[in-house]
Amino acid sequence: MEESVVRPSVFVVDGQTDIPFTRLGRSHRRQSCSVARVGLGLLLLLMGAGLAVQGWFLLQLHWRLGEMVTRLPDGPAGSWEQLIQERRSHEVNPAAHLTGANSSLTGSGGPLLWETQLGLAFLRGLSYHDGALVVTKAGYYYIYSKVQLGGVGCPLGLASTITHGLYKRTPRYPEELELLVSQQSPCGRATSSSRVWWDSSFLGGVVHLEAGEKVVVRVLDERLVRLRDGTRSYFGAFMV
C-alpha cells in the first residue's frame, strides 16, 4: 500500500530582491517635528532674553532709588525747606534792588548812594560798593533807575537840561561809559518863580556786563532829586 505524501503548496515569486524597502511619509513627519522644535527653542530664548532685560532695568531702578534715599535729609521739615532753598539758590539769577536814602545825595559830584538792606532793598548775587552795583557773573542784565525830581520855580544856576544816566565802569577803559541817559528841563514847567513842580525820570534797558564791571547812577544837579520812603527813587539790575 503506497504511503500518501502530502506536499505543501509552494509559491515562488521570481523578482529582484536587492531593492531596499522604504516606508512612505516617515521623513516628512521627522522634518516637521524638527522645525517645530527649533521654533519653540527660539521662542523660549526670546522670552528668556526679555526677562533678563526687564530684570536689568528693575535692578537699575532699585539702585537709583537707593541713591536718592541716601541723599535725602533725615532731619525734620526744616531740613527739607533748607534743601529746597539751597536748590533754588543755585537756580536763581543775580538780582538787586536799591532804594534812595537820605545819604544818597553826596553833594560831591559823585554817583548817587543807595540803601542795600532796609525796606525794599536787597542784594542777591551782586555786590555793592560806593554807589556802584558790582557784577559777579558775566551775562546780559536788565538795568534800571528812577529818580524823583522836584523844586520851586526854575533853580538858579541850572543848565538847560537835567541829565540822569546809568554809567559803566570797566577795568578795560579809564573813564565811565554811558549806558542809558535821559535829559529834560524843569524850567519849562515852572511858569513862575514860586510854583512847585514835580517830575520823574526812568531809565531801563538790557546790556551785557562782564564780571568785575560796575554800574552807577548819576544826576547832574542832584539837589533836585527828592527822596521818600524808598519808593520814589531806586536803582537795580537782574540777569536775563
From Swiss-Prot:
A molecular function GO annotation: signaling receptor binding
GO cellular component: cytoplasm; extracellular space; plasma membrane
Cytoplasmic side: 1-37
Glycosylation sites per record: N102
This protein's name: Tumor necrosis factor ligand superfamily member 14
Source superkingdom: Eukaryota
Matches recorded under PROSITE patterns: THD_2 (PS50049)
Role summary: Cytokine that binds to TNFRSF3/LTBR. Binding to the decoy receptor TNFRSF6B modulates its effects. Acts as a ligand for TNFRSF14/HVEM. Upon binding to TNFRSF14/HVEM, delivers costimulatory signals to T cells, leading to T cell proliferation and IFNG production.
Domain THD: 94-240
Complex and partners: Homotrimer. Interacts with TNFRSF14.
PANTHER family for this protein: TUMOR NECROSIS FACTOR FAMILY MEMBER, TUMOR NECROSIS FACTOR LIGAND SUPERFAMILY MEMBER 14
Disulfide feature: C154-C187
Membrane-crossing segments per the record: 38-58
Keyword Secreted attributed: yes
The gene coding this protein: TNFSF14
Pfam families recorded: TNF
PTM entry text: N-glycosylated. The soluble form of isoform 1 derives from the membrane form by proteolytic processing.
Keywords: Cell membrane, Cytokine, Cytoplasm, Disulfide bond, Glycoprotein, Membrane, Secreted, Signal-anchor, Transmembrane, Transmembrane helix
UniProt-annotated site: Cleavage, residues: Q82, L83
One GO process term, biological-process aspect: apoptotic process
Induction: Up-regulated after T-cell activation.
Family: Belongs to the tumor necrosis factor family.
Nucleotide-binding as UniProt keyword: no
Tissue: Predominantly expressed in the spleen but also found in the brain. Weakly expressed in peripheral lymphoid tissues and in heart, placenta, liver, lung, appendix, and kidney, and no expression seen in fetal tissues, endocrine glands, or nonhematopoietic tumor lines.
